[in-house]
Amino acid sequence: MQTLKVDLGERSYPIYIGEGLLDQPELLAPHIAGRQVAIVSNETVAPLYLERLSKTLGAYSVLPVVLPDGEKYKNWETLQLVFDALLSARHDRRTTVVALGGGVIGDMAGFAAACYQRGVDFIQVPTTLLSQVDSSVGGKTGINHPLGKNMVGAFYQPNAVLIDTTSLKTLPQRELSAGLAEIIKYGLICDEPFLGWLEDNMQALRALEPVALTEAIRRSCAAKAAVVGADERESGVRATLNLGHTFGHAIETHMGYGVWLHGEAVAAGTVMALEMSMRLGWIDQPARDRGIRLLQDAGLPVVPPQEMTPAHFMEHMAVDKKVLDGRLRLVLLRQMGEAVVTDDYPKEILQATLAADYRAIVAQL
């Protein structure tokens, strides 16, 4: 097992990474103050791991809360089910909410914990690669709104993050690839040597080779923890973690939540960010192509939806959380391994990026 730390002073917490951690109650016990535990999961993950985690937490009074599965259920109505369950079971302020699932479950369970009786303890047990390397770390919680993704939520840090890498054995290949999009992101924004490592180990990662998988998760979590420790509430450097997300969130919203997986939309959005960075003269074509090839090798889509026009993108990006004073800020690459958040770009460059023929770009690789 490896242990990392998210350093936030009195609110610091550990990230445990290893095999078989779901069966180790001694890891969770120090982070549970009361006798009541609510495990929030979904209809897909619960049959696989809920009984196992409930047994590990056998010393506590465990309340299972099983929600419908999918991004389209990340809304007020589903969140209300968590509150209904907690109140019906008379859970008090010393309860601990445990999120068992992917990013949707982690975001909703965390938001429920932030709101319930003005805040109760919260533990992340992510079971998808994307949630293990990204959404479970850093305290972003929330739900979607019909007009925009993750528009209602709170910063609320967990007491601990427990990553059992064996849970990835039940993950569909499409979901695994979606998680690889976020791993690739770390190399692009802050760790250029990591890109070379990923190029050498991509097939091992897709085959769930344990050593490669643990190293990729550790390296990604370490990068995320460092950024969160420096900028918890995304007032500065943390926004660089959103490479590809402004374009990607527009894709998710326009196509309908859940049609494109989050990681898939981020991958296509990252290609657009690479293209715009090249058009600004910040990276060259070989660098752009290198990023696209790596996303392709991960089994990810690298062409935005053909039905989306520049006007569609602009409509959805206008409500992006990085918009300040009416100016759309974008995360772009100054060079491979260095990202910047900027609103200082010619509008015609953005329009050209949105209108680019990505099928032709990919075809010439």
Swiss-Prot record:
GO terms for biological process: amino acid biosynthetic process; aromatic amino acid family biosynthetic process; chorismate biosynthetic process. Its EC number is 4.2.3.4. NAD(+) binds at residues 69-74, 103-107, 127-128, 140, 149. Keywords: Amino-acid biosynthesis, Aromatic amino acid biosynthesis, Cobalt, Cytoplasm, Lyase, Metal-binding, NAD, Nucleotide-binding, Zinc. It catalyses: 7-phospho-2-dehydro-3-deoxy-D-arabino-heptonate = 3-dehydroquinate + phosphate. One of its GO terms (cellular component) is cytoplasm. It holds the Pfam family DHQ_synthase. Its main location: cytoplasm. It is found in: Cytoplasm. Zn(2+) binds at E182, H245, H262. Pathway: Metabolic intermediate biosynthesis; chorismate biosynthesis; chorismate from D-erythrose 4-phosphate and phosphoenolpyruvate: step 2/7. Catalyzes the conversion of 3-deoxy-D-arabino-heptulosonate 7-phosphate (DAHP) to dehydroquinate (DHQ). HAMAP family: DHQ_synthase. This is 3-dehydroquinate synthase. It comes from Pseudomonas entomophila (strain L48). The gene is aroB.
